[in-house]
């Protein structure tokens, strides 16, 4: 397995999706993140992959996009009640039709948005655009379908999509990176 290739692919897709989100005013050129939210992907990923892999052939955009919705949900949970969020099992994000309407369930029941609201429509549009771009970037690599490398490229793409979703929600909630200037003597503070 060419780990260097996978790392470069992940960086390329992340940069491209961040560019799209920034151009559309959904992010400000920075991928907002918290370690808690980022690391929670490792908990959700095995179940997500089990669902998404079966969707790739018929619904490639959905198989990537729903990871973004999971990112939205986890970032929202981090802001509102992290202890409850980390106990939320993957399938609790399912809609009435399971994986198929997970997006609508998360928007309506986790984020608390009306499906026909401007915010919900803006999120749907940016996640769809990012997922379509991710699928295009995967296809451009011309990797043999259903090969181990195809699986690993897909896994990297959905991990990035999850982080994009989380960043979108953190921005929507009002979080932003700000430079903090520490006083010059900060490093010489006495130990407690």
Regions found by a protein language model. Name each.
Residues 1-192:
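Intrinsic-disorder/low-complexity detector
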């Amino acid at each position: 397995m060419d780990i260097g290739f996978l790392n470069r692919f992940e960086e390329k897709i992340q940069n491209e999706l961040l560019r799209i989100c920034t151009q559309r005013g959904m992010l400000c050129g920075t991928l907002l993140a918290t370690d808690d939210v980022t690391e929670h992907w490792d908990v959700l990923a095995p179940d997500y992959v089990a669902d998404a892999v079966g969707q790739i052939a018929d619904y490639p955009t959905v198989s990537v996009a729903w990871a973004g919705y999971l990112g939205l949900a986890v970032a929202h949970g981090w802001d509102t009640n992290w202890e409850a969020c980390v106990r939320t099992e993957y399938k609790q994000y399912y809609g009435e039709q399971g994986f198929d309407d997970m997006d609508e369930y998360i928007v309506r029941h986790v984020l608390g948005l009306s499906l026909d609201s401007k915010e919900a429509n803006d999120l749907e549009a940016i996640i769809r655009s990012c997922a379509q771009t991710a699928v295009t970037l995967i296809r451009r690599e011309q990797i043999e379908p259903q090969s181990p490398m195809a699986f690993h490229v897909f896994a990297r793409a959905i991990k990035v999509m999850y982080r994009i979703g989380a960043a979108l929600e953190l921005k929507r909630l009002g979080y932003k990176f700000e430079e903090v200037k520490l006083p010059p003597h900060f490093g010489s503070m006495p130990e407690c």
